[in-house]
A protein has these predicted regions:
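Alpha-helical transmembrane segments
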Residues: 3-41, 72-91, 113-215
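Membrane-interfacial loop-to-helix junctions in multi-pass inner-membrane proteins
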Residues: 19-30, 49-64
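Membrane interface segments of multi-pass transport proteins and intramembrane proteases
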Residues: 47-57, 94-104
Length: 215
């Protein structure tokens, strides 16, 4: 819970101070982050109340993750900004956009494939992080490096944005709200660093499913 609260508060302050948001992309990310955290909180709460290691039934946990991930995915395909950019896209890219798209057989098929792909990523990553949280400081330490990379990537996209004055259109990046995403990732790193101080072996506080599923 402390990781989620610290991250959201720091992101909100950072977004307001810099004028980067709160943006639609940032709000979607917070929704996904908090939504998965709530599922983990329910799981932890059941374990505590029933004094046993079994919390939510696995199928119930997956259903919750699919519901949150699906709403998140649909949210990325609506609400374009003033440049016509969406938080998500059906196009498949590597370092640059390619001619490949999930909508190869029509928009309806593309959206369905996009939902499946998003759910696969969210449920796989969320549960993998939960499994990683088996040693003191492991999940938090690994996540710091992961979100450190995301901070660098999103900030680089911000300074190389196609909407920047004088941007080279052949080398720029057309992504939505990269600065707000960088602020969120940086806020999460700060929250994890503070948490890691008390979670390193021998741990005095624990992440639980609340923090692990959110990450």
């Amino acid at each position: 819970v402390v990781i989620i609260l610290a991250t959201v508060i720091a992101w909100l302050i950072g977004s307001l101070v810099t004028g980067a948001g709160p943006s639609w992309s940032g709000l979607l990310l917070v929704f996904l982050f908090v939504g998965l955290g709530v599922i983990g909180l329910l799981d932890d709460g059941i374990k505590i109340m029933r004094q046993r290691s079994l919390g939510l039934h696995p199928s119930g946990k997956i259903i919750g993750q699919v519901a949150v991930a699906s709403l998140f995915a649909l949210g990325t395909l609506i609400m374009p900004n003033e440049f016509g950019e969406y938080a998500g896209t059906l196009e498949i890219s590597f370092a640059r956009p390619t001619a490949l798209t999930l909508g190869f057989a029509g928009l309806g098929v593309g959206v369905v494939l996009y939902l499946i792909w998003t759910n696969l990523i969210v449920t796989a990553w969320s549960n993998a992080t939960n499994l990683t949280d088996g040693l003191d400081g492991l999940a938090a330490g690994v996540s710091i490096f992961v979100f450190g990379a995301y901070t660098f990537i999103t900030y680089f996209q911000r300074i190389q944005a196609c909407t920047q004055l004088g941007a080279n259109q052949s080398t720029c990046y057309s992504t939505r709200d990269p600065l707000d995403l960088a602020i969120f990732c940086a806020a999460l790193i700060g929250a994890l660093a503070g948490f890691l101080w008390w979670n390193a072996s021998p741990a005095q506080i624990f992440m639980g499913d609340t923090g692990a599923l959110a990450l």
